[in-house]
Design a protein with these regions (language model features):
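Residues at or immediately flanking beta-strands
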Residues: 59, 224, 282-284
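ABC transporter nucleotide-binding domains
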Residues: 3-4, 11-202, 207-208
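C-terminal coupling/interaction segments
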Residues: 263-310
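ABC transporter nucleotide-binding domain
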Residues: 168-261
Length: 310
């Protein structure tokens, strides 16, 4: 069953339409990365799915029902970008309060707080919490009642690298248990191994959607071969030039190493010729990363291949 289906959804306000004509779905047991620059329409799309806004055009179905229906909403967990809590209450008290509001069992509160790494701070007032701790408390609140759909808007904001890795491991566990998860972010480094598909928005339009292999096929960006010479690097360079003659490539030299950017469809015949030459001591192959694909699809330009989006 799909967690949600957007069919040519648009939302217009102040003479702007964001998102516009977006068609997208999320399956149960799937993590979808929703990426785009600030103002691309990520948060508005989430609010449409939550029923906090109404689409101007298109069709929207959430968990087989209508967005905003209380019977649907009780199966959704949501972590907003900026979380705020009553500073005089403890983490345990706040989570118990939200459990009652959602109709979830308060008995799960200690377990959820431990799950997000707040076991030792559950009885401390939240005014003493760091930003990262408040973010983890917000995640625990989103997990109340074992939601079937989990919406996370910039969930790694304020988290250190260890806490971020813990978050991604938890999301994988929830996915394996059947939860559909939307991970909304403009920060790409580190997220690539943890998502099943990526959707890239710019100016409200969906530029691309798919798993990484399909996005790479759509982009048809070059792969990079890093080659270490078994002897004289000049001889290796001559061998590479011979193997790639007539093909569109970019060759770079750094000490005993050569890097070759080449069309992915030309990769195997060139590799076979290079390996047969005996001129290579070592090699590695780098495919376009999620960051590279993001830059390609939004058309930003100016970022070197294998560089990073900030």
């Amino acid at each position: 069953m799909n967690c949600f289906e957007l069919d040519t959804i648009s939302h217009s306000y102040d003479r702007e339409t964001v998102p516009k004509d977006v068609t997208l779905q999320l399956n149960s047991g799937e993590i979808l990365g929703l990426f785009g620059h600030n103002g691309a329409g990520k948060t508005t799309t989430i609010k449409l799915i939550l029923g906090l806004m109404k689409p101007s055009a298109g069709r929207l179905s959430v968990l087989g029902g209508e967005a905003g229906d209380p019977k649907v909403s009780q199966h959704i967990g949501y972590l907003p970008e900026n979380v705020m809590f009553y500073p005089q209450l403890t983490g345990r008290e706040i989570l118990a309060h939200f459990a009652r509001l959602k109709g979830a069992s308060p008995a799960q509160v200690p377990e959820l707080l431990a799950q997000v790494g707040l076991a030792d701070a559950m009885d401390a007032r939240t005014r003493t919490y760091s930003k990262g701790m408040r973010q983890r408390l917000g995640l625990a609140q989103a997990l109340l009642g074992k939601p079937r759909l989990l919406m996370l808007d910039e969930p790694t904001v304020g988290l250190d690298p260890v806490a971020t890795a813990d978050l991604y491991r938890l999301l994988r566990q929830l996915r394996d248990e059947g939860t559909g998860i939307v991970l909304c972010s403009h920060v790409l480094p580190g997220v690539e191994p943890y998502i099943d598909r990526a959707a890239i928005l710019t100016a409200g339009a969906l530029q691309a959607v798919g798993d990484l292999p399909s996005l790479r096929r759509q982009a048809n960006m070059p792969v990079t071969l890093d080659l270490t010479s078994a002897g004289d690097v000049g001889e290796l360079e001559n061998t590479v030039n011979a193997a790639t003659r007539g093909r569109e490539t970019v060759l770079r030299r750094d000490g005993q190493q050569l890097s070759v950017d080449i069309d992915p469809h030309e990769k195997m015949p060139v590799l076979q010729e290079l390996l047969a030459s005996g001129a290579i001591a070592d090699l590695s192959i780098h495919q376009p990363s999620l960051e590279d694909l993001y830059v390609h699809f939004i058309g930003a330009g100016g970022l070197a291949h294998r560089g990073g989006a900030q």
